[in-house]
């Protein structure tokens, strides 16, 4: 590797909006990062996330327009 072209890799403190703090390594020179969500408060990691699947495109179409009778019944 060439010397002098890579940024310094230093220990960095990360502070979340929920108050959780942890230490990692980063190339950010200040050594301090503030984030809005982390693994302690993100819904995906806490299990509070709801997965909504209404059954696909056919079910969505039928819900919007309703089931119609075949053209032969008219």
From Swiss-Prot:
GO terms for cellular component: ribonucleoprotein complex; ribosome. GO terms for biological process: translation. Keywords: Metal-binding, Ribonucleoprotein, Ribosomal protein, RNA-binding, rRNA-binding, Zinc. InterPro entries: Ribosomal_bL28/bL31-like_sf, Ribosomal_bL31, Ribosomal_bL31_A, Ribosomal_bL31_sf. GO terms for molecular function: metal ion binding; rRNA binding; structural constituent of ribosome. It comes from the Bacteria. The keyword rRNA-binding applies. Its cofactor is Zn(2+). Binds 1 zinc ion per subunit. Pfam families: Ribosomal_L31. Binds the 23S rRNA. Part of the 50S ribosomal subunit. This is Large ribosomal subunit protein bL31. It comes from Mycobacteroides abscessus (strain ATCC 19977 / DSM 44196 / CCUG 20993 / CIP 104536 / JCM 13569 / NCTC 13031 / TMC 1543 / L948).
């Amino acid at each position: 590797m060439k010397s002098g072209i890579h940024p310094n890799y230093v220990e960095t403190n990360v502070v979340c909006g929920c108050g959780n703090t942890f230490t990692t390594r980063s190339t950010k020179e200040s050594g301090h990062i503030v984030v809005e969500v982390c693994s302690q408060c993100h819904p995906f990691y806490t299990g509070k996330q709801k997965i909504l699947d209404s059954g696909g495109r056919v079910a969505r179409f039928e819900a919007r327009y309703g089931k119609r009778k075949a053209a032969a019944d008219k």
